[in-house]
């Protein structure tokens, strides 16, 4: 199977996001790369599902909370930018302050 560099990067992000998802499910606090991959994967999959840019920008802020990540990670992740593939093309999604202080219910 031949993959372009962009396809390889997307596959790597997906794999890292799935690993982070498994760790979060086990109650392991996510580090910086895991948190970034988790949120990035959420945005990429949401785009493929047909969600809009504005919807993903807002939803991306509530995927993880401070209780899901290691100390210091929220301060390091002040924004995430993802070039996601939507049904009508590739668009840039920017999520500011992606790790919320609120506790998910």
UniProtKB/Swiss-Prot annotation:
SUPFAM superfamilies referenced in this protein's UniProt entry, alphabetically: Urease, gamma-subunit (SSF54111)
Record flagged with keyword Hydrolase: yes
Gene3D superfamilies in alphabetical order: Urease, gamma-like subunit
Enzyme Commission numbers on file: 3.5.1.5
Intracellular or extracellular location(s): Cytoplasm
GO cellular component, one term: cytoplasm
Protein name per UniProt: Urease subunit gamma
Organism encoding this protein: Bacillus subtilis (strain 168)
Upper taxonomic lineage: Bacteria, Bacillati, Bacillota, Bacilli, Bacillales
């Amino acid at each position: 199977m031949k993959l372009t560099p962009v396809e390889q990067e997307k596959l790597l992000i997906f794999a890292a996001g799935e690993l982070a998802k498994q760790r979060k499910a086990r109650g392991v606090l996510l580090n910086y790369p895991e948190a970034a991959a988790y949120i990035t994967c959420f945005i990429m999959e949401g785009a493929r599902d047909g969600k809009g840019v504005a919807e993903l920008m807002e939803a991306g802020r509530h995927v993880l909370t401070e209780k899901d990540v290691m100390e210091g990670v929220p301060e390091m992740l002040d924004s995430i930018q993802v070039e996601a593939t939507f049904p009508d093309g590739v668009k840039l999604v920017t999520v500011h302050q992606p790790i919320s202080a609120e506790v998910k219910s």
